[in-house]
Amino acid sequence: MKKIENFNILICNTPNIENAKLIAHNLVKEKLAACVNLFNGMTSIYEWEGNIEEETEVTMLIKSKSEFLNLIEERIIELHPYDTPEIIELKVVSSNTKYFEWMNGVLKN
């Protein structure tokens, strides 16, 4: 394992697989994300406007660099149907060396 800085995993939920794929393809094509994992059929329970809601969503794990956070946020907001899309950043502290090198090689310089 290699200690790394400035890499992150972003979590974002979307209402359906089509929207998740649209966002994922755009982020990878634009080299803002090295990889996006899609978890279909996740159940989200949350409060919205005073009501407890339960929805089936698609969770995206977006693997990227911290420096792209604002650009990724802009793209998600542009392509996402929710008024308030969830975008949460988790810092990556270490990674398999070869995976890190691959990620670094496919992302924008």
Residue ranges and their predicted role:
Residues 1-109:
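Positively charged, small/polar-rich N-terminal and surface patches that mediate targeting and assembly
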